[in-house]
C-alpha cells in the first residue's frame, strides 16, 4: 500500500493489536519506517494477555458479544470513564454487535499467537513505547519488555492508566507528535 501511494518513509503509530502489526512493518521493512510509536501493545503473549484473550475467545464461541463488550470495556478504561459508560453497555453492545464473530476470533487468535520477541531487536528506527501501569489486557510490564529489546527506544508509562492510555492520557497526542517532530 505504501508503494502504491508513493510513500517512501513514514512515521508509524501502532496501538494495541496495531502495535503488533507495526512491529512487523518495522522489522520486515526498516527502510519504510522513519520513527515508530508502539502504544499499549506487546512483543509476546504474557499471562495477562493469554487469560483475557482466551476468555474473549470462549465468549465468542458462545456468541456472547454483550459479555465480550462488557469485559473489554471493564478491562480497558479507568473507573472514572467506566462510570460514564456502564449505563449504556446494553445499548452500545447492541449497536456495535457484528453479524458474526468470525473476524473477532481470527484477530483474537492472532494476538494470542503474536510473538516477535526474537526479532524485536531488529527494529532500528527511533521508537517511543507507551503504556499504562494498570493495563489489564496486555499487562503493565509489556511496554518495559518492548523498550528493553529495542535499541533506540524511549519509554513512557502513565500512572493510573490502562489499555485506554491512548484515549485517556490528556497529553498522549502531544507526546506522540513531539516524538515525531524531534
Feature map (PLM): residue ranges:
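Catalytic histidine-centered segment of alpha/beta-hydrolase-like enzymes
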Residues: 161-173
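Gly/Ala-rich beta-loop-alpha elbow adjacent to hydrolase catalytic centers
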Residues: 14, 18, 22
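Short beta-strand immediately N-terminal to the catalytic nucleophile in serine-hydrolase-like folds
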Residues: 12-14, 39, 130
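Conserved alpha/beta-hydrolase "acid-adjacent" motif
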Residues: 136-142
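Flexible "cap/lid" loop of the alpha/beta hydrolase fold
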Residues: 23, 27, 34-62
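Conserved alpha/beta-hydrolase catalytic His-Asp/Glu region
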Residues: 47-49, 67-119
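Conserved acidic catalytic loop of the alpha/beta-hydrolase fold
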Residues: 1-10
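Short beta-strand/loop motif that positions the catalytic acidic residue
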Residues: 123, 129-131, 135
Amino acid at each position: 500500500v505504501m508503494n502504491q501511494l508513493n510513500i517512501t518513509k513514514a512515521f508509524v503509530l501502532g496501538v494495541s493489536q496495531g502495535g503488533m502489526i507495526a512491529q512487523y512493518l518495522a522489522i520486515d521493512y526498516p527502510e519504510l519506517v522513519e520513527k515508530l510509536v508502539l502504544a499499549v501493545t506487546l512483543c509476546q503473549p504474557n499471562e495477562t494477555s493469554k487469560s483475557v484473550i482466551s476468555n474473549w475467545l470462549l465468549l465468542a464461541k458462545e456468541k456472547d458479544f454483550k459479555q465480550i463488550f462488557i469485559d473489554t470495556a471493564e478491562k480497558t478504561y479507568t473507573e472514572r470513564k467506566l462510570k460514564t459508560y456502564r449505563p449504556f453497555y446494553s445499548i452500545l453492545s447492541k449497536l456495535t454487535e457484528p453479524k458474526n464473530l468470525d473476524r473477532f476470533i481470527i484477530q483474537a487468535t492472532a494476538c494470542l499467537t503474536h510473538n516477535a520477541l526474537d526479532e524485536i531487536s531488529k527494529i532500528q528506527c527511533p521508537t517511543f513505547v507507551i503504556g499504562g501501569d494498570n493495563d489489564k489486557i496486555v499487562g503493565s510490564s509489556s511496554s518495559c519488555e518492548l523498550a528493553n529489546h529495542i535499541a533506540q527506544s524511549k519509554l513512557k508509562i502513565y500512572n493510573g492508566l490502562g489499555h485506554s492510555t491512548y484515549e485517556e492520557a490528556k497529553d498522549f497526542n502531544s507526546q506522540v507528535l513531539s516524538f515525531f517532530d524531534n
